[in-house]
Amino acid sequence: MIQTLDRLMTNPMPEGRVEDILRPEGENPLLEKGYVTTSVDALLNWARTGSMWPMTFGLACCAVEMMHAGASRLDLDRYGVVFRPSPRQSDVMIVAGTLVNKMAPALRKVYDQMPDPKWVISMGSCANGGGYYHYSYSVVRGCDRIVPVDIYVPGCPPTAEALVYGILQLQKKIWRTQTIAR
């Protein structure tokens, strides 16, 4: 070990090369296979799936079903889902109900205020594609025209159980993502 330290002191490393004291030639099979970054990805995704903090953007009758999902019968707290009042504290936005043209800039503004990484759940037929009011002049035909949507929950209005299923699907999607570039 002392010889390695002497060699490092007398012969500096070439630019761009990292040398490990325990492996002087730089071969590290764990790093080559991506083991360390995979483990950090798994740790981050485990933490993100266990602590999803949605911000509600209830626009119509689907918001009532969202309140049912947060009540004691289904208890979203057991999945680590805690509703937050501020977009700066949340990482999931649940868009529930009819999105009209006047409300679209506000939706985008709230989405932009959320910290990264952020996910969007579109809840109900109106949020997914305009729903019953699809042909109205003032209705946005799907909130995916304003913000990128990760999970679509169908129904008019969807049941609280369907929203819980959508949240569980989002947790699976988060678990599969790779956050660290290799």
Swiss-Prot record:
Cofactor note: Binds 1 [4Fe-4S] cluster.
UniProt KW Ribosomal protein keyword: no
Molecular functions per Gene Ontology: 4 iron, 4 sulfur cluster binding; iron ion binding; NADH dehydrogenase (ubiquinone) activity; NADH:ubiquinone reductase (non-electrogenic) activity; quinone binding
Cofactor(s) listed: [4Fe-4S] cluster
Catalytic activity of the protein: a quinone + NADH + 5 H(+)(in) = a quinol + NAD(+) + 4 H(+)(out)
Highest taxon, organism lineage: Bacteria
Keywords, in A-Z order: 4Fe-4S, Cell inner membrane, Cell membrane, Iron, Iron-sulfur, Membrane, Metal-binding, NAD, Quinone, Translocase, Transport, Ubiquinone
GO biological-process terms attached to the record: aerobic respiration; electron transport coupled proton transport
Top class in the EC scheme: translocase
Presence of keyword Iron-sulfur: yes
GO CC annotation: plasma membrane; respiratory chain complex I
Assembly mode: NDH-1 is composed of 14 different subunits. Subunits NuoB, C, D, E, F, and G constitute the peripheral sector of the complex.
Family annotation (HAMAP family): NDH1_NuoB (MF_01356)
Protein name: NADH-quinone oxidoreductase subunit B
Taxonomic placement: Bacteria, Pseudomonadati, Pseudomonadota, Gammaproteobacteria, Lysobacterales
